[in-house]
Each structure stands twice: as C-alpha cells, then as structure tokens.
Amino acid sequence: VVAVVGFLFSALPMIYLHLASIGRLSPVSHTISDYIFLTHGGELLALSAVSLAVGSAALLRVILAVGVPRGGPVQVLFSVWCLGLLLAAVFPTDPLGSETSLPGAVHRYAGLAMFVSLPLAGFLLSVRFRESLAWSGAAIVVRRLSMVSAAVSVLFLLSHVPIVFSNGKGDEVLSGFLVQGLAERLLFGSIFALLGALLLGARTALRRVEEVVPCP
C-alpha cells in the first residue's frame, strides 16, 4: 500500500508540472528538473522525488521479505537510487546554458547514480527471480524492462554531450541539438514501468508465499 501511494504521489505532481509548463518549457530540450523554475515547481518536484523514494523503499522491503537476501547488492543499489532521488530534490539543477554550480553538480551526479543503479538492481533481481518459484512469472518482464531502462539511461547520458561541450556559452550554441528532456522522459517512463512490474511481481510472490506457509 505504501509503495502504491508513494508512486501515485510521485506521478501526480509530474503530470501537473507537465501541463503547467506547456508553452513555457520544451519537453524535448528541458529536463524535468527545469520545472523548478516554475511557480511552486521546487516544492512539487521535491514532493515527487520524496514520494518516489518512499515508494521505492517500501517496495524494497516487500522484495526482501519474499526471498531476496538482505545486505546484498540489490539492497545497496536500491539505497543508491533512493538517496539519489533525495539529493536531486535538495540540490537544484542549473538553468539551461549557465555554468555548473556546486548544487547543480551534486544534482547531476545524483541523477547519474540513480539512473545507473535502478536498472542494474532490476537486472540482478531478474536473475534472482528465475531461481524462485514465487517470482518466476516476473523474471522475464523485469529483465526486459531493466534492459530497456539501461539502454535509455545511456541515451540520456549521451544527450548531455552538447551541454558539456557548450562550455556555458548559452542556449543559442545548443539550438537544434538538445534532446535530453525527451530522453529523460523516456527514461522515467521505463523506470516507472520497471517499478510497476516489480510491484506486481512482489504482490504475486507474497500471495504465493502465504499460500505455501500454513496458518498457525
């Protein structure tokens, strides 16, 4: 329940900010983090990130309760994902075309850590799921979505190349080359799909475990 509520409260502010930014920010060239420059954008982005972190932590708790070892790489990677979300919420991004500040650098590397960690965690879980009867139905879906998320994550990182080589000279240098906003939205779509698959798989696995274990 906590995971579902967390994911819901993460998605709703994003939907609102996308609608509120129509005509002001480009979904192709501006990242989701740029919504901080909208009215109440910072608060809504923080709500979305914290809710996603809470939902992910609740999902991890269920996953650990049905067969995945505690303290292993999956738990570490999920923790990196959640910590990255919180850091990205606390440290805002820099305006497009400006020089990188310390908070902006923290935001960027927090994003790098979280976008690498979750697809890798999903892939490791899919390997683990193939060995478990309770999770067997989710293994293939989680594996494929993890690979898609990893591929789109690489695309998102590559989309920042024009920004790196712009040397802070302004938006006009980058005109026609910025697609990191589109890449990030595709990435978040694949990540939400991965988290949804894990959530459904966890629900099924928990039910199977309860059916096997007799009531006292």
Spell out what each predicted region is.
Residues 127-208, 215:
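Terminal transmembrane helical module of multi-pass membrane proteins
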Residues 34-54:
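Interfacial helix-start motif at the membrane-water boundary
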Residues 26-40, 176:
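Perimembrane loop-to-helix junctions flanking transmembrane segments
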Residues 76-104, 156-166:
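Hydrophobic alpha-helical transmembrane segments of integral membrane proteins
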Residues 87-138:
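Membrane-proximal helix-loop-helix units in multi-pass membrane proteins
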Residues 1-5, 67-80, 136-150:
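Interfacial segments of alpha-helical transmembrane regions
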Residues 7-26, 160:
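Alpha-helical transmembrane segments of multi-pass membrane proteins
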Residues 50-78, 119-133, 199, 205:
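Internal transmembrane alpha-helix with an interfacial aromatic "cap," most often the third helix
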